């Protein structure tokens, strides 16, 4: 047994309702309306689940819900999620800065990768989820002297970095690294 065992997993659901005796729903043309309602219901559950992953589960009063002494505060706030400071008091790299050199961004990516692999013993292949600002900056050419690959291409060559993907829940200099290998 580990001290971090257990996570509260709420059930996410949504629904839609049609009056089954309504004659319109006894015709084939009603299938499109029912399919649209089902799609809307599924999208609602997906939005709630993504919010739960990033921001945790709160009760109606806005407090984190607790069950059997367990709670989930989301990737941003939970104590069981490793947080690495990218600011001046940490790794000191701003992946969104257009003035940062490609070499500095690559060095910052190596430091971040090593923090996860060496310090936290995370040896699975990493998938990096980054903000839109970071993804835009990583699409710059690595060298201005000749148009070779992008900064993202260079980071993807690093051992252990399998993919870099954009996530709309992230903003600014936020990165979520998930071992998916």
What do the predicted segments below correspond to?
Residues 1-14:
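Assembly/oligomerization interface modules of large self-assembling protein complexes
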Residues 13-107:
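Alpha-helical scaffold segments that mediate packing/assembly in large oligomeric complexes
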Residues 19-21, 130-134, 179:
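Helix N-cap / beta->alpha transition motif
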Residues 37-40, 108-115, 151:
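Short, hydrophobic/aromatic alpha-helical segments in well-folded domains
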Residues 45, 49, 109-119, 155, ...:
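Hydrophobic, Leu/Ile/Phe/Ala-enriched alpha-helical segments that form helix-helix packing faces
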Residues 49, 53, 117, 121-124, ...:
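Residue-level signal for secondary-structure boundary elements
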Residues 56-59, 66, 100-141:
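Structured, hydrophobic secondary-structure cores that serve as assembly/anchoring elements
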Residues 87, 136-181:
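Sequence/fold signature of self-assembling virion shell proteins
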């Amino acid at each position: 047994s580990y001290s971090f065992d257990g996570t509260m997993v709420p059930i996410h659901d949504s629904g839609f309702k049609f009056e089954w005796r309504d004659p319109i729903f006894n015709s084939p043309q009603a299938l499109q309306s029912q399919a649209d309602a089902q799609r809307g219901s599924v999208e609602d559950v997906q939005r709630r689940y993504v919010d739960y992953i990033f921001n945790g589960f709160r009760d109606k009063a806005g407090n984190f819900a607790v069950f059997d002494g367990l709670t989930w505060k989301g990737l941003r706030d939970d104590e069981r999620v490793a947080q690495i400071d990218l600011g001046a008091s940490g790794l000191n790299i701003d992946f969104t800065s257009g003035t940062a050199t490609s070499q500095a961004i690559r060095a910052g990516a190596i430091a971040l990768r090593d923090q996860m692999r060496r310090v936290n013993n995370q040896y699975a292949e990493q998938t990096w989820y980054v903000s839109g600002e970071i993804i835009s900056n990583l699409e710059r050419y690595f060298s201005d002297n000749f148009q070779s690959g992008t900064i993202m291409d260079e980071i993807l060559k690093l051992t252990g970095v399998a993919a870099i993907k954009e996530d709309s829940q992230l903003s600014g200099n936020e990165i979520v690294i998930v071992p998916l290998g």
